[in-house]
Design a protein with these regions (language model features):
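Catalytic core of DAGKc-family lipid kinases
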Residues: 49, 58, 96-172
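Short amphipathic alpha-helical segments
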Residues: 36-38, 91-94, 116-118
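Active-site glycine-centered loops adjacent to acidic/histidine catalytic or metal-binding residues
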Residues: 27, 84, 107
Length: 172
């Protein structure tokens, strides 16, 4: 039994509708699970801005990379929500595409350091409005270290595991 022709149907649907398509990838465990509590409001902001949104909660490490790589080309924009790691994973997946869509980011990690550096507004509603908006995209460099892309910080040496080994309740 053959499954539905998702790829062909997505292309036909895009040709027949004016709504823009967004893939929203969020990490349900980032920032003590805060994203899940704001999910409805975030998706509502996307809908009000004219986006037809597919929501995908990551299931494990590197899942955002896989989903962005496998599904990203079917969307006009990919927005991720989570910590700096979720942003890096999502960007890594999109970098594997020949024509990646724009990437938006809603910070929801323990420290949101990257979001602050990029001047993304605090609060899910304002960050979702920015991610769904039509403003000129911000360009920033993406580095690679040992063929692994990173969007914010790359570290090596004795203290690289400190962030991962620190319990979540101590990060805030």
């Amino acid at each position: 039994m053959r499954g539905p022709d998702w790829n062909g149907r997505a292309r036909r649907d895009r040709e027949n509708h004016d709504m823009k398509r967004m893939l929203f990838v969020y990490n349900p465990t980032a920032g003590k699970g805060a994203a899940a509590a704001h999910l409805s409001g975030v998706v509502d902001q996307f809908t009000k801005a004219g986006w037809l949104t597919t929501v995908y909660p990551t299931q494990d490490k590197k899942d955002a990379t896989r989903v962005a790589r496998e599904l990203g080309s079917y969307y006009d924009r990919v927005v991720c929500c989570g910590g700096d790691g979720t942003l890096s994973e999502t960007a890594a997946g999109l970098l594997e595409l020949s024509r990646p869509p724009l990437l938006g980011y809603i910070p929801s990690g323990s420290t949101n350091d990257c979001g602050a550096t990029l001047r993304i507004p605090r609060g899910y509603k304002k960050a979702a409005e920015l991610a769904a908006g039509d403003e000129e995209p911000l360009r920033w460099d993406i580095g690679t270290l040992n063929q692994q892309p990173f969007v914010y910080v790359a570290a090596f040496g004795a203290f690289t595991e400190v962030s991962y080994d620190t319990p979540q309740d101590l990060k805030k």
